């Protein structure tokens, strides 16, 4: 495949896939990510996808479209998508571009996104 040597980590936490985007996502990587997530949903039968964009400083119309397409594909496979950690500047850019990301809910951080999908992430309770 591409010679970038960089892949976007996709972790499975129970019934949820956690995708963490960092820095700039090139077109080829974004399209590969879309295929990877769709395949993982299909094979693992997860019910939710959390896309953490707290490490993304700039969103263009292409990335916005890819995020919307990931959410649409997930929905067709009976999984809900939550976008987590959006920076204020990214939110403003999406509005200016007219990208409302239909079918995708948003959360302030990954912990809240997981809770929206019914996964409890209680910290500080119990042992160590």
Identify the function of each model-found stretch.
Residues 6-34:
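STAS-typified acidic loop motif
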Residues 44-47, 51-100:
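Amphipathic alpha-helical interaction surfaces in cytosolic regulatory modules
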Residues 33-37, 78:
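Expand to "…catalyze enediolate/carbanion chemistry for C-C bond making/breaking, isomerization
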Residues 103-113:
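Short acidic-hydrophobic, aromatic-tinged amphipathic segments that line or gate anion-handling sites
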Residues 90, 97-105, 122-127:
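Conserved glycine-centered short motifs in functionally critical loops
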Residues 114-118:
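Short, charged, surface-exposed secondary-structure boundary motifs
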Residues 2-4, 13-15, 43-47, 76-77:
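Short flexible coil/turn linkers enriched for glycine and charged/polar residues
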Residues 1-4, 119-128:
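Intrinsically disordered or compositionally simple regulatory linkers and C-terminal tails
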């Amino acid at each position: 495949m591409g010679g970038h040597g960089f892949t976007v980590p996709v972790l499975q936490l129970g019934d949820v896939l956690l995708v963490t985007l960092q820095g700039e996502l090139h077109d080829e990587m974004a399209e590969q990510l879309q295929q990877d997530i769709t395949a993982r949903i299909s094979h693992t039968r997860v019910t939710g996808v959390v896309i953490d964009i707290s490490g993304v400083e700039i969103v263009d119309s292409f990335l916005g479209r890819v995020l919307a397409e990931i959410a649409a594909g997930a929905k067709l496979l009976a999984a809900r998508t939550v976008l987590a950690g959006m920076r204020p500047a990214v939110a403003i850019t999406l509005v200016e571009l007219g990208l409302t990301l239909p079918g995708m809910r948003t959360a302030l951080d990954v912990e809240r996104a997981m809770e929206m999908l019914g996964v409890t992430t209680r910290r500080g309770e119990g042992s160590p």
